[in-house]
């Protein structure tokens, strides 16, 4: 009798499979809540009676958290991809591809053709842990999330790169009232996208596909999304009952070939030895040495408090502040002396409007006839929704609300850091107004919600979890990395047997390091300031506050109402700006308050925005998801000059039919990357040679999905990923060939030491040729051309085109070259003339100019997500960097300036510092390595010239919530600065 035991110790669960003579006689699956070794012992002990005390057995361990246990117990370890292949070979031999999703691991194994195995690295995006986190965010269990997904009507775009980014997309959807069913299905679609883009990396998933792992077994909604995306029918998509245990079954199969034999008791003894093994890890100094040190710390911070008075004991006028944040809703009512009469702080649970209705009803009851709420203000992510729903008097951007509250506690404040549930906001104060704003871009690294979801996943409340870390003797050093990578650090610490207290303290330190070094990019405490106010609910956690003070080496001010500062600032703003009457709805309307949500897609322009329509009864309605004013009806802002819009229309015009009689061939031009600049050149050149040119359509999300299967790396920027869809689009149009040359150099504008294209722009045609299978037998023209040297280009063009098409003569190529350079020059002149017209309009109408500095392809609406329209909606005239860079001398920069696009941006930044009504907004594509250089230089040029630097990161994430905060904060700071200047000059 042969008994083999396979133990799969994953990142969130432990699985055991017992095989007797080739038949599975026992299988079990349990979450370990980080008690990895103890749970393994428990599962073996539970199978003891079934196996028999003296029965000889073989055992092997697998799984992402299994190696440490296997080493400590001296039990054979099998790598999990190998275990997967073992299981498949025995149980589903016809499989072509295996997709396995675990707690924090994802794998694809290609079994036919060229054998290939791929695993996620240290990123846990698109795995079971991610689904768990999203369920917590929606305040449902994972199984309820699955039920919701099956009632979906539409799919929202949610970033599939990693869990934290997806969270940044989901939260604004919830705040804007999106249906939970649709969000749930969109979460599953994000997992599918992450698996295909992140792991398949250009290799097609086809044939018989076997889906393994807990998430793919338990979640029917996820199964449906995989089947639909991969276009698999039921005959080719396999979801076996063994799915959650397959890797453990593979480990049992592998164990059959090992040498060591055990009895159940000797196996238990080995595992128990592992459970008691000492931990080897990097430690940090403790947060507090003893209770006395902690008491002194608490007493010091207790000094920064605010007066309170019970609302039932107060009589007179009162002012309401609401902070509808990304994960929590806060309400504060203050009296005439700024004392707090009432406050409330709770999780949104995905529906902030319900929370506020409930609390307003309660508040009106407490106020009776004695207290009159005469003014109100709302701030935060849900500001617009709540202002419309409840008739709140004022809406203000959250940075301004937090600054107003901070000034109340520390009049000399010169630096504020606010760590909320999902965002980190830092702002420097100069001359009593906000001078510089740092927001975490598209990443919630080191924010409060990460610690909260982590605490919950380990079975603790956030308060209990954080208290555990206060007196940890040896906090674990988890680094200062993206939170999903930190998950892996925590996993490693768990493998090593670190206690919950050490992990809790280590996480607190990591959150602080992320805020300081990733968001603020501080080099020393002096970069922050002398009078630092910390706020946001996360700083109510003493462990994080202590870590922050230890890291910067100085004491800070934490108001006792740290978590209520946005709402308190809003209440102070309502008091400062009180009007004669309030528009806040009263008890009668509140009693009949209702909130109905429906979704639709706007068809008024090419953005095709997903609109969420919130009806509140009584004729009150709020529409979100729009990037322009059109779907809102009513009075529309005058169409202000917008060079982004003008350039897009101008470039699209090059796609119009040329009417060439008897063309040599129909050549496709992909409408992306550097073709957003060189389209005039190539169109004129090819048409002069006698070709019909066909332009691919303007990018859309659907086009991206069409080409997604051939993207070989998920780390490349979104503009490059879109090129795969453009190639597919041109192939569908039936072109004879596609022309897309490789170009190491750009045109030389003589403002830099060199004139390179970035490597992605320069050589992406090579990558497309290698990865888009349809190009294998297609005429994909990708010669290496350089346009900076006209003579050299002419020589190469003659050789290439006369060699490929004998009917084309040398003199035709020479004539085409002349026409192409002329067309390109005319385009540049048109851009500059249009730019000057826009600037004149702004000057004549006393408007601000937003110089959007980016790359030519940032004009693509699928890449910028309508950011130009969003900025224009605030009453700014839009100009691009290529219209203004030449209006000033080249600025001094502290880096090797060798990129054409970069030198334009530096020139645009200098121009902004010389024009009073111009503001700079830099667009950066996420994943753009060389823009890491430009951002610091652009900031330095702006700040040295007395201007505010604003950066917006753009990628797959289409929700503009964070961008809106940044733009409004910048405009508020500019306005405040002007008011201050007027006062000083008066």
Where are these regions (language model features)?
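An N-terminal assembly and electron-transfer interface module characteristic of large anaerobic redox
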Residues: 3, 120, 124-131, 444-451, ...
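Short glycine-rich, Thr/Ser-proximal phosphate-binding strand/loop in the N-terminal lobe
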Residues: 4-46, 116-117, 121, 322-362, ...
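Glycine-rich phosphate-binding loop plus the immediately following alpha-helix
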Residues: 36, 113-154, 162, 244, ...
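Glycine-rich phosphate-binding loops at beta-strand->alpha-helix junctions
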Residues: 65, 200-229, 240-244, 379-382, ...
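Glycine-rich phosphate-binding/hydrolytic loop that grips phosphoryl groups
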Residues: 128-132, 239-275, 404, 451-453, ...
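Adenine-nucleotide phosphate-binding core of ATP-dependent small-molecule kinases
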Residues: 166-197, 488-517
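Phosphate/ATP-binding catalytic cores across multiple sugar-kinase/actin-like superfamilies
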Residues: 186-207, 251, 299-308, 362, ...
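Acidic, glycine/GT-rich loop-and beta-edge segments that sit at the periphery of enzyme/chaperone cores
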Residues: 257-317, 425, 576-640
């Amino acid at each position: 009798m042969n008994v083999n035991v396979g133990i799969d110790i994953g990142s969130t669960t432990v699985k055991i499979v017992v095989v007797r003579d080739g038949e599975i006689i026992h299988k079990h699956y349990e979450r370990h809540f980080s008690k990895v070794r103890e749970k393994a012992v428990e599962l073996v002990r539970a199978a003891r009676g079934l196996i028999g005390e003296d029965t000889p057995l073989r055992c092997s361990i697998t799984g992402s958290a299994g190696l440490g246990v296997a080493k400590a117990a001296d039990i054979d370890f099998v790598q999990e991809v190998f275990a997967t292949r073992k299981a498949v070979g025995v149980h589903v031999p016809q499989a072509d591809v295996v997709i396995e999703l675990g707690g924090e691991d994802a794998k694809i194994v290609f079994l036919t053709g060229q054998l290939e195995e791929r695993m996620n690295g240290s990123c846990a995006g698109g795995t079971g842990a991610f689904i768990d986190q999203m369920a917590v965010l929606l305040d449902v269990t994972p199984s309820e999330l699955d039920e919701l997904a099956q009632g979906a009507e539409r799919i929202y775009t949610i970033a599939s790169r990693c869990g934290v980014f997806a969270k940044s997309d989901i939260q604004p959807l919830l705040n804007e009232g999106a249906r939970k069913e649709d969000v749930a299905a969109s979460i599953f679609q994000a997992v599918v996208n992450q698996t295909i883009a992140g792991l398949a990396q250009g290799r097609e998933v086809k044939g018989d596909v076997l889906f393994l792992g807990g998430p793919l077994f338990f979640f029917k909604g996820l199964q449906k999304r995989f089947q639909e995306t991969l276009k698999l029918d039921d005959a080719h998509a396999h979801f076996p009952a063994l799915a959650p245990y397959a890797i453990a079954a593979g480990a049992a199969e592998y164990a059959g070939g090992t040498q060591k034999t055990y009895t159940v008791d000797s196996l238990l003894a080995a595992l128990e030895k592992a459970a008691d093994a000492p931990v080897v890890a990097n430690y940090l100094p403790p947060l507090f040495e003893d209770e006395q040190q902690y008491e002194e710390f608490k007493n010091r911070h207790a000094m920064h408090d605010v007066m309170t008075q019970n609302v039932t004991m107060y009589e007179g006028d009162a002012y309401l502040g609401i902070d509808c944040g990304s994960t929590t809703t806060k309400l504060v009512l203050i009296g005439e002396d700024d004392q707090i009469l009432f406050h409330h702080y709770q999780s949104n649970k995905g529906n902030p409007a319900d929370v506020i209705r409930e609390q307003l009803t309660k508040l009106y009851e407490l106020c009776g006839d004695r207290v009159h709420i005469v003014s109100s203000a709302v701030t935060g992510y849900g500001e617009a929704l709540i202002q419309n729903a409840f008739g709140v008097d004022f809406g203000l951007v959250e940075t301004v609300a937090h600054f107003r509250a901070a000034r109340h506690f520390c009049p000399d404040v010169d630096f504020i850091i606010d760590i909320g549930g999902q965002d980190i906001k830092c702002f420097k104060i100069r001359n009593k107004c906000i001078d510089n704003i740092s927001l975490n871009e598209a990443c919630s690294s080191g924010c409060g919600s990460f610690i909260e979801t982590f605490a919950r996943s380990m079975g603790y409340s956030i308060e209990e979890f954080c208290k555990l870390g206060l007196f940890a003797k040896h906090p674990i050093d988890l680094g200062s990395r993206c939170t999903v990578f930190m998950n892996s650090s925590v996993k490693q610490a768990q493998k090593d047997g670190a206690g919950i207290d050490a992990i809790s303290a280590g996480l607190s330190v990591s959150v602080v390091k992320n805020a300081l070094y990733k968001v603020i990019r501080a080099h020393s405490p002096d970069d922050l300031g002398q009078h630092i106010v910390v706020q946001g609910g996360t700083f109510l956690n003493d462990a994080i506050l202590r870590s922050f003070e230890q890291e910067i080496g100085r004491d800070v001010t934490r108001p006792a109402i740290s978590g209520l500062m946005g709402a308190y600032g809003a209440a102070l703003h309502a008091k400062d700006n009180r009007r004669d009457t309030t528009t806040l709805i009263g008890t009668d309307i509140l009693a009949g308050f209702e909130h109905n949500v429906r979704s639709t897609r706007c068809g008024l322009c090419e953005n095709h925005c997903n609109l969420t329509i919130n009806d509140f009864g009584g004729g009150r309605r709020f529409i979100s998801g729009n990037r322009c004013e059109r779907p809102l009806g009513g009075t529309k802002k005058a169409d202000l000059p917008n060079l982004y819009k003008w350039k897009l229309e101008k470039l699209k015009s090059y796609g119009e039919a040329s009417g060439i009689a008897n063309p040599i061939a129909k050549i496709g031009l992909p409408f992306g990357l550097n073709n957003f600049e060189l389209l005039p050149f190539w169109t004129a050149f090819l048409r002069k040679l006698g070709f019909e040119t066909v332009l691919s359509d303007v990018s859309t999300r659907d086009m991206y999905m069409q080409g997604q299967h051939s993207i070989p790396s998920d780390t490349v920027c979104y503009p490059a990923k879109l090129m795969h869809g453009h190639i597919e689009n041109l192939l569908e149009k039936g072109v004879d060939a596609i022309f897309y040359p490789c170009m190491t150099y750009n045109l030389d504008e003589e403002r830099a030491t060199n004139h390179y294209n970035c490597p992605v722009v320069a050589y992406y045609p090579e990558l497309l040729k290698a990865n888009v299978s349809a190009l294998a037998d297609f005429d994909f023209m990708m010669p290496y051309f350089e346009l900076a040297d006209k003579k050299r280009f002419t020589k190469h063009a003659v050789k290439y085109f006369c060699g490929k098409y004998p009917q084309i003569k040398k003199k035709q190529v020479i004539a085409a070259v002349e026409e192409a350079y002329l067309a390109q020059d005319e385009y540049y002149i048109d851009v500059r003339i249009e730019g000057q017209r826009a600037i004149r309009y702004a000057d004549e109408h006393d408007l601000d100019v937003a110089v959007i500095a980016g790359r030519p392809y940032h004009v693509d609406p699928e890449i910028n997500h309508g950011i130009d329209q969003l900025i224009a909606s605030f009453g700014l005239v839009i100009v691009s960097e290529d219209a203004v860079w030449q209006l000033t001398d080249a600025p001094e920069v502290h880096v090797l300036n060798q990129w054409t696009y970069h030198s334009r941006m530096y020139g645009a930044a200098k121009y902004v510092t010389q024009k009073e009504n111009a503001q700079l907004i830099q667009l950066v594509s996420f994943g753009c390595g060389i823009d890491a250089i430009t951002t610091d230089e652009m900031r330095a040029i702006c700040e040295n010239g007395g201007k505010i630097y604003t950066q917006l990161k753009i990628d797959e994430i289409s929700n503009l919530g964070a961008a809106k905060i940044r733009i409004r904060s910048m405009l508020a700071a500019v306005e405040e600065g002007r008011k201050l200047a007027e006062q000083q000059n008066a």
